């Protein structure tokens, strides 16, 4: 009797422990058949940006091709269709990688509920992380870590298994004629590359070209100093174990390992505090005075479109719209600007990122925003307000990043591009004046913080 493997955010064949378990069980059953299935909600798919739609589609195409075009795709608003498919396929087991974020947990519970009385068991194993969320805890009382550094030390001490190769000796069940990969309903400005093979190639390129200087260059958006693997991790086209396995104690390797651990830390925090997906980790910040109404909506739209008049902010927002990705340093800059210069709630920015980032990860997105907003675990203090102009001079010293994404400023050849309003011809191509005075809004932000301080 065949077994179903439900692909989720683990769209790869290598180093997939849950898939290996499913394959081994199918071999032991004597049937040797595995039915690969992917479930998605077409309504949710429709709400994604064009780049996110294309990103998912290309990821699924690559997965499908890697298994001989046998992936069964189920489009349904709920888990009933997956349960019905399993019943019609006459299987007794559905295997999957366990999810630890609120949406993934809800999917698991919904499917288990639909399977009640069918005789079909849902088998959940492994996770999307090197160490399962909820595992790392203080040795004194078993409680969770609120601060990253001690979490990292405990996480590193626990360790992880070596990457596992795909189990041999099983077969994919041929796909039915009805199933097909979803087609994007929105356009994208370029062809998105995705899939396990591309992820492994990207990692090899990073190892050979950039990891040695990662510590120095990772904060420079004008350089290709990062791994560009966040998309692959978000889709599960590569597992963190694969990235961690070859790392040594060299400086660049250590810093890269610590960046992977930030992803694991945020996953742990969200698992233990599921309400923080869209609510404050530090509840007192709910009382912060944020701007609302028509004026706030107008400010949000200028931020979203990259027309604030602050080049570093606008370059980041335009990079997001044109590529579906944004450099991590710039994510912090635009987040600080939204919360502390525009006085808007972090959830508005997090939602925009969710709609547009091809590397969207629920835990990293929510808690990355809360870190910058000063209301999360181990957060940057609220009174730390990024100066978007100085950040530009520091991390894009020649202005190459800004010129790449803001063509209206391409005529300004040096670092002066970060303050074009100071030049006679700086705004001649229609780039807007700054929409606010940063020093004034910084003071306003700190004044609002005083209002919620515990007396």
PLM regions and their residue ranges:
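Short, contiguous strand/loop micro-motifs
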Residues: 6, 50-51, 98-99, 215-216, ...
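Hydrophobic alpha-helical segments, especially transmembrane helices
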Residues: 9, 109, 264, 330-332, ...
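Short secondary-structure transition/capping segments
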Residues: 78-90, 114-124, 169-182, 376-381, ...
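Glycine/tryptophan-enriched, flexible segments
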Residues: 120, 141-288, 395-396, 400-455
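Active-site-proximal binding-pocket segments
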Residues: 224-247, 251-408
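Trp/Phe/Arg-rich N-terminal binding region typifying the photolyase-homology
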Residues: 1-163, 252, 318, 364, ...
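Generic alpha-helical segment signature
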Residues: 56, 196, 306-309
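Short coil/turn segments at secondary-structure junctions
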Residues: 6, 47, 300, 429-432
């Amino acid at each position: 009797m065949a077994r179903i493997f439900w692909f989720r955010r683990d769209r790869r064949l290598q180093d997939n422990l849950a898939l290996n378990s499913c394959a081994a069980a199918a071999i032991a059953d004597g049937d040797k058949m595995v039915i690969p299935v992917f479930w998605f909600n077409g309504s949710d798919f429709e709400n994604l940006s064009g780049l996110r739609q294309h990103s998912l589609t290309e990821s699924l195409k690559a997965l499908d091709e890697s298994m001989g075009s046998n992936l069964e795709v189920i489009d349904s608003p709920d888990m009933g269709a997956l349960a019905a498919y399993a019943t019609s396929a006459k299987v007794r087991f559905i295997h999957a990688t366990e999810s630890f974020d609120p949406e993934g947990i809800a999917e698991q519970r919904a499917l288990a509920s639909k399977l009640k009385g069918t005789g079909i068991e849902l088998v959940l194993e492994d996770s999307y992380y090197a160490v399962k969320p909820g595992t790392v805890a203080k040795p004194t009382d078993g409680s969770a870590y609120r601060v990253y550094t001690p979490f990292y030390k405990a996480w590193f001490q626990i360790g992880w298994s070596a990457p596992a190769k795909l189990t041999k000796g099983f077969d994919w069940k041929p796909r039915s004629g009805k199933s097909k990969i979803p087609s994007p309903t929105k356009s994208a400005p370029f062809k998105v590359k995705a899939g396990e093979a591309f992820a492994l190639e990207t990692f090899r390129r990073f190892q050979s070209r950039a990891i040695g200087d990662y510590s120095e260059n990772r904060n420079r958006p004008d350089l290709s100093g990062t791994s560009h693997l966040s998309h692959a991790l978000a889709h599960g086209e590569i597992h963190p174990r694969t990235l961690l396995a070859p790392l040594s104690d060299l400086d660049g390797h250590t810093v890269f390992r610590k960046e992977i651990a930030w992803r694991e830390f945020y996953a742990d925090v969200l698992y233990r505090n599921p309400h923080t997906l869209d609510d404050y980790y530090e509840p007192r910040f709910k009382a912060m005075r944020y701007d609302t109404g028509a004026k706030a909506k107008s400010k949000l739209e200028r931020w979203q479109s990259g027309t604030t008049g602050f080049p570093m902010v606008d370059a980041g927002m335009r990079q997001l719209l044109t590529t579906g990705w944004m450099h991590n340093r710039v994510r912090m800059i635009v987040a600080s600007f939204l919360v502390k210069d525009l006085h808007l709630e972090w959830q508005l920015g997090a939602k925009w990122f969710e709609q547009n980032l091809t590397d969207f990860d629920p835990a990293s997105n929510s808690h990355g925003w809360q870190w910058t907003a000063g209301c999360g675990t181990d957060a940057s203090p609220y009174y730390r307000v990024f100066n978007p102009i100085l950040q530009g001079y520091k991390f894009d010293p020649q202005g190459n990043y800004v010129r790449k994404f803001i063509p209206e400023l391409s005529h300004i050849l040096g670092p002066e591009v970060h303050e074009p309003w100071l030049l006679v011809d700086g705004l001649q191509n229609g780039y807007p004046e700054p929409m606010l005075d940063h020093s004034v809004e910084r003071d306003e932000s700190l004044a609002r913080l005083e209002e919620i301080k515990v007396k």
